[in-house]
Structure formats: C-alpha cells, structure tokens
Amino acid sequence: MLELDIQRATDAATPEDAALRRWCELALRQRSADSEMTIRLVDEAEGRELNHTYRHKDYATNVLSFPADVPDELLDIPLLGDLVICVAVVEREAAEQGKSLEAHWAHLVIHGCLHLLGYDHIEDEEAEEMESLERELLAELGHPDPYADDETDSITH
C-alpha cells in the first residue's frame, strides 16, 4: 500500500488526488513493499528556489526528485522520498509540446517516481531503460509516447 502525502503550495489548478495516486501506484507497482512518499505541487518561485538550492540552476524545472536516504529497517513504512512538481512549468511544457495536460502530468509523476526507485537518465543506456518503462506505463494509461516527436528529452532536470 502506498501512503501518499500530497501538498499543494499553489493556487493553480492541479490534478485530483486520485489521479496522482493512480500514476504513482502504476510506477511503483514493481515494488512489493508498502511505501511512503510526498508530492509537493509548487508555484514557479518555489520551484526556482529549490532547483537553485539543490541543483545550482537558476530556473524552475518541471519535477525534482528527492530519494530518501533512510534504511528501510529503521522505518515502519519504507520512505521512498519526495517529488516537487512546478505546476506552471508543467502547464507551459504541455502547451509548447502540444501534449495534453493530463498526459504530461502522468509522465512527470511516473518519471519522478522512477527516480525515487533508483532509475536515472544520465548515461544513454540508463536513459533508454527508463524511457522505455515510461512509455510502457503511459501506454497502459492510454497516453502516447512522450518522446515520439521530441528530438531531445522533455524532462528538463
């Protein structure tokens, strides 16, 4: 079972809790253990501040993943970590890339969850594995390949 804490630190429209949960559970289903995580939905100012603090980049990015660094045996429920998603960036990217807002939200939540599970896209081989899994999961939701018409990775972090 997933214990999901959803924090809305913005007045902008955001997906419903049920949708966020569905996308997380889909991405995390390979993990058999109970898990706990947080999704914080932020405005551009907070997104920029966090990206600057943790990545030394002076702009808001779409999703930041903060995997927990606590041994599972020390917790009642294993803590996966936190996702911080900048609502304005998600909306802007979806419009610029001609994607539905729901498909882009689903992609970024799944992408962030995979980071919490240890997936990465720094090396080409790792990126191919991660993107392949993202495509598969999004197809299950009926969403198109997020990388199909994109010569560059749409994930900006």
Swiss-Prot record:
Belongs to the endoribonuclease YbeY family. This is Endoribonuclease YbeY. Residues 136-157 are annotated as: Disordered. Its cofactor is Zn(2+). One of its GO terms (biological process) is rRNA processing. One of its GO terms (molecular function) is zinc ion binding. It comes from the Bacteria. The lineage of its organism: Bacteria, Pseudomonadati, Pseudomonadota, Gammaproteobacteria, Pseudomonadales. The keyword Nucleotide-binding does not apply. It holds the Pfam family YbeY. It comes from Pseudomonas putida (strain ATCC 700007 / DSM 6899 / JCM 31910 / BCRC 17059 / LMG 24140 / F1). Binds 1 zinc ion.
